[in-house]
């Protein structure tokens, strides 16, 4: 479902580090933990997967990132948002909700899903992740 191929990225004009020649495949249904020291590229990799790079963080990018068959650099942000979300390390920095159900529904609400479609999807997701 997620494929990162020969990706190298360096941020423009920030002096921030870069990642070099990253290759990673993540199968549908997998749970992956990115860990490492500060500045090693964890956040950069998540920004590549969720489309923030190249749309909101400029820099030099080579290689390819595909999510659900979509090449991230060639896909409109709204289509990426239908497939990708982020969960932050600190729960207090999560979006705007205080409960799990609302967090799960957040993306669907922003895409204007009807309630009768959202509720079963929230229940299905909670069951899939054993909550």
Task: Set out the residue ranges of the language-model regions.
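A short, flexible loop at the N-terminus of ABC-type nucleotide-binding domains that lies
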Residues: 1-4, 9-22, 53-58, 74-76, ...
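Conserved hydrophobic segment flanking the Walker A/P-loop of ABC-type ATPase nucleotide-binding domains
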Residues: 26-28, 79
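Short, conserved post-Walker A segment of ABC-type ATPase nucleotide-binding domains
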Residues: 32, 43-56
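The feature captures the beta-strand-to-loop junction immediately N-terminal to the Walker
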Residues: 35-38
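Short helical segment in ABC ATPase nucleotide-binding domains corresponding to the A-loop/adjacent helical element
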Residues: 50, 85, 92, 98-109, ...
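Conserved ABC transporter NBD signature motif
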Residues: 58-70
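Conserved ABC ATPase "signature" region
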Residues: 69, 116-131
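ABC ATPase NBD coupling module
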Residues: 70-85, 110
